[in-house]
Amino acid sequence: MSGRVTARRRVVRLTPAGEIRRQDTLAVEEPLEIRIGGQSLTVTMRTPGSDIDLVHGFLLSENMIGAAEDVVSARYCAGTDEQGRNTYNVLDVELRRPVPVRTRHVLTTGACGLCGKTALDEVRAVTRFPLPAHGVTLAADVLADLPATLRAGQSVFQATGGLHAAGLFTVDGTPLAVREDIGRHNAVDKVIGWALRENRVPAHELVLIVSGRASFELVQKAVMAGIPILGAVSAPSSLAVDLAEEAGLTLVGFLRGETMNVYSGAHRLRSVSAGTRTA
């Protein structure tokens, strides 16, 4: 599977000095069809690798499972490319308890037909792991260092410049799992799936860091896994902030260097400075 994460392609690089023809390294993007008991559930475009974790995280986010033991088996189905090699692009999952399967059963795609308020109500209603109002806290200086630790684990991004990343950390800054993917939601599903399979869900004492922006979908996935703190290198969306406030999640954006914007749940962060001012 590791050989399928990157691919080499010819590229013409245009520079002020002229054309340079060379090989370039690209991140692989392939479809993964998820089936439940042989019935197609959804197809996601992903970077191959950690597919079992991805599926566990996705099913948890969709409230189809709540623990690792809810999955009896997950196996690749037969499927070959033009060279006769297994594509490893179809995963069939057997669940311990039957659940209704609707094709493309998702809470968080643009095609799901949910308005913002309805989406908030549905996520709040179905989460199995409500976030505790108090409990874990995180030092702001520790949080500020986590994006650099995340980048250090992005080996494929360093080779391609084309992948998102997500990481789970302890509140003292120890990295537990870092995953990369062409889709930021897949990267989050991969680390959440890892946590589920390691019996660390609900993840009430962990921190989720993502390499890009914080969308509603990523906040929803954090809430469904019981993660109390989500930090993003870029901006959150308005709906992401709405959901974070509703769920009691600490949402931090523009996490760059020593500065950051805390959009909700500031009570979980311990500042190194006692000074506070309003702009």
Swiss-Prot record:
A biological process from GO: Mo-molybdopterin cofactor biosynthetic process
GO MF, one example: sulfurtransferase activity
Alphabetical list of Pfam families matching this protein: FdhD-NarQ (PF02634)
Keywords, in A-Z order: Cytoplasm, Molybdenum cofactor biosynthesis
GO cellular component labels: cytoplasm
Active site: 112
Compartmental location: Cytoplasm
Origin superkingdom: Bacteria
SUPFAM superfamilies according to UniProt: Cytidine deaminase-like
Protein function: Required for formate dehydrogenase (FDH) activity. Acts as a sulfur carrier protein that transfers sulfur from IscS to the molybdenum cofactor prior to its insertion into FDH.
Stated family: Belongs to the FdhD family.
Protein name as catalogued: Sulfur carrier protein FdhD
